[in-house]
């Protein structure tokens, strides 16, 4: 007779494998429908219904196949201000179990003044979600990014990864890059980037970044509650563990690891705007049926990225909900790392800029701005904020408003707060 714990573990693994089976089956059904309606013989019996079935199959196969694949960065080159094309080579600067420090190396280019570390969210999507952000910064900056790994591919032997580990990763990456680095945190990592900087302020002051730009993140979720924060308060930790956490199945290297599955996260993302997504896929099927769709059309470019989801470790998800949203440890300035209090007021020499979107329905205006009230040791001359009119959550780090309004503000902010300290010798390869 199995022990209760063994039965529970098998239940969690069975649920994980069941979701993967459903995804795989839908991909197969789409591929089968597309193949069956593509036989030349079907042309002998012209029927609009066959075109619709073929289109449904093509869209379905593509959509479900993208859910388990990490997108490429697809940044082979960019055009600089002189109209010259520059090649781009993504290089791993620092490899770790749960994420790498990635540098977008530009061969033959003189090193740029601004060294930027983008802290990418670990919230269901890959760091490639910031592709357009990276591309927009390349002409003026040496760009680095946190490239987080899919938890399903990380063996259990690698250990845990929670909000404290995330904070320590950011601190290590900042140490590696040196004090002339400008940290730009986007959405979910905002409170942890603030904590990592405060951690360095006490443990290694010379490694603090020159500036810290915080874009639309939940420093104080209760400052302006949204559906996301309301959900965090409406469920208990026990309910979250029971309904959201599963164990990776036998198909992947992380077999047995407790995770918040990417497929489950995706279902939550889609349910928030179900009508909008249903309309988008219906319209795309119609375009494919009329032979008006393309491999790189607007729909495919967006959904190839949106549907590509990754598992996050259970302890990271649960500790984020409990410590950032429920207990508000960052907002109350009582966050700890390895038992040591991280005091945000210890930040005294790092310029901080807040970016928020007026129509942000994920991290509402005010949630990120709360960081400035915590920085009691920082002079007002080193504090700045910007509320972008009409911008939603994604609009503050991608799209037209980012390119035309927000990006120039950040570049100017970095220029005004640059440090001339020589680069860490260990990073001499950062010159591009």
What are the residue ranges of the model-derived segments?
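Alpha/beta-hydrolase-fold enzymes
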Residues: 2-52, 56, 179, 196-315
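Catalytic histidine-centered segment of alpha/beta-hydrolase-like enzymes
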Residues: 362, 388-404
């Amino acid at each position: 007779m199995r022990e209760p714990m063994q039965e529970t573990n098998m239940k969690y693994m069975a649920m994980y494998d069941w979701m993967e089976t459903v995804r795989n089956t839908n991909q197969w059904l789409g591929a089968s429908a597309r193949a069956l309606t593509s036989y030349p013989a079907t042309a002998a019996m012209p029927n609009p219904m066959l075109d619709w079935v073929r289109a449904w199959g093509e869209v379905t196969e593509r959509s479900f196949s993208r859910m388990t694949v990490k997108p490429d960065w697809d940044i082979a080159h960019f055009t600089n201000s002189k109209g010259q094309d520059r090649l781009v080579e993504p290089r791993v600067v620092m490899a770790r179990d749960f994420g790498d420090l990635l540098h977008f190396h530009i061969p033959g280019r003189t090193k740029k003044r601004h060294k930027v570390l983008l802290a990418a969210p670990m919230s269901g999507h890959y760091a490639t979600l910031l592709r357009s952000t990276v591309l927009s910064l390349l002409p003026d900056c040496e760009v680095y990014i946190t490239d987080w790994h899919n938890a399903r591919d990380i063996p259990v032997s690698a250990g845990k990864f929670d909000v404290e580990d995330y904070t320590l990763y950011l601190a290590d990456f900042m140490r590696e890059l040196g004090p002339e680095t400008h940290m730009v945190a986007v959405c979910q990592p905002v409170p942890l980037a603030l904590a990592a900087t405060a951690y360095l302020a006490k443990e290694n002051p010379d490694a603090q970044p020159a500036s810290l730009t915080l874009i639309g993140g939940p420093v104080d979720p209760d400052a302006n509650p949204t559906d996301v924060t309301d959900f965090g308060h409406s469920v208990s930790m026990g309910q979250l563990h029971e309904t959201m956490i599963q164990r990776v199945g036998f198909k992947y290297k992380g077999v047995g690891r407790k995770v918040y599955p990417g497929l489950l996260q995706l279902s939550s993302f889609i349910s928030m705007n179900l009508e909008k997504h249903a309309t988008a896929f219906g319209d795309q099927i119609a375009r494919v049926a009329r032979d008006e769709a393309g491999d790189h059309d607007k729909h495919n470019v967006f959904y190839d990225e949106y549907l590509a989801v990754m598992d996050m470790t259970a302890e990271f998800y649960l500790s984020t909900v409990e410590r950032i949203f429920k207990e508000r440890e960052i907002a109350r300035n009582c966050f700890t790392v390895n038992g040591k209090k991280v005091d945000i007021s210890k930040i005294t020499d790092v310029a901080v800029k807040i970016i928020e979107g007026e129509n942000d329905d994920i991290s509402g205006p005010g949630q990120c701005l709360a960081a400035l009230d915590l920085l009691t040791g920082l002079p007002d001359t080193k504090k700045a904020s910007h509320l972008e009119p009409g911008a939603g959550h994604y609009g503050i780090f991608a799209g037209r408003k980012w390119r035309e309004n927000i990006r120039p503000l950040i570049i100017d902010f970095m220029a005004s707060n640059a440090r001339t300290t020589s680069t860490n010798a260990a990073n001499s390869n950062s010159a591009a």
